[in-house]
From Swiss-Prot:
InterPro entries: RNA_pol_sigma-70-like, RNA_pol_sigma-70_dom, RNA_pol_sigma70_ECF_CS, RNA_pol_sigma70_r2, RNA_pol_sigma70_r4_t2, RNA_pol_sigma_r2, RNA_pol_sigma_r3/r4-like, WH-like_DNA-bd_sf. Belongs to the sigma-70 factor family. ECF subfamily. Negatively regulated by both YxlD and YxlE. Sigma factors are initiation factors that promote the attachment of RNA polymerase to specific initiation sites and are then released. Positively regulates the expression of the sigY-yxlCDEFG operon upon nitrogen starvation. Also positively regulates ybgB. This is RNA polymerase sigma factor SigY. It comes from Bacillus subtilis (strain 168). SUPFAM superfamilies: Sigma2 domain of RNA polymerase sigma factors, Sigma3 and sigma4 domains of RNA polymerase sigma factors. A motif (Polymerase core binding) lies at residues 48-61. GO terms for molecular function: DNA binding; sigma factor activity. PANTHER family: RNA POLYMERASE ECF-TYPE SIGMA FACTO, RNA POLYMERASE SIGMA FACTOR SIGV. GO terms for biological process: DNA-templated transcription initiation; regulation of DNA-templated transcription; response to stress.
Length: 178
């Protein structure tokens, strides 16, 4: 889908055309799901958050002003939903600070079953705290600028830089320890 087509669909969706929003949903679904899966490492949670993201996007579509790409706007919503989810689960998260080996094995199996490869880097990445994992993923996998990430996560640019630095530092430390 080219930019003009996307802009046309966004405008039609803003005017109440549900078919246009459905087309946007289908176009961006896979991208958003993969982003959330990398972020959460939980397929069911990723699916749930994609649905919530599109619901919020649908409800607040009129507030999309086109200052950024539509996909950036969706990632911003998805990131905030994910971080909100993590805050709600903070007590439980503290008890289970790292992803269990069983969950990682399941994800590795799922990834390899689809013909992809689970690397040592993903192992180390999966152990990062979500506050660090999110900015590292947005910066180094998706290529967003620190400023864009700050807007998406509603944190200061300096905070983004320090979280990316700290996340990479932790990965390097683990790498050196092995």
């Amino acid at each position: 889908m080219d930019t003009q087509e996307e802009q046309r669909l966004i405008q039609q969706a803003k005017e109440g055309n549900d078919e246009a929003f459905t087309a946007l949903f289908h176009y961006h679904y896979s991208f958003l799901y993969k982003y959330l899966l990398k972020l959460s490492l939980h397929p069911d949670l990723s699916e749930e958050l994609v649905q919530e993201t599109f619901l919020k996007g649908y409800i607040h579509l009129r507030s999309f002003q086109g200052r950024s790409k539509f996909s950036t706007w969706l990632i911003s919503i998805a990131s905030r939903l994910y971080l909100d989810h993590q805050k709600k689960r903070k007590r439980e998260w503290k008890r289970n600070q790292t992803v269990t080996e069983e969950t990682i094995r399941k994800i590795k199996w799922d990834v390899s079953a689809k013909g992809a490869e689970w690397s040592e880097t993903l192992d180390l990445f999966s152990k990062l705290d979500p506050k660090l994992r999110t900015p590292v993923l947005l910066r180094h996998y998706y290529g967003y600028t620190y400023a864009e990430i700050g807007v998406m996560l509603q944190i200061k640019e300096g905070t983004v830089k320090s979280r990316v630095h700290k996340g990479l530092q932790q990965i390097r430390k683990e790498w050196d320890d092995e």
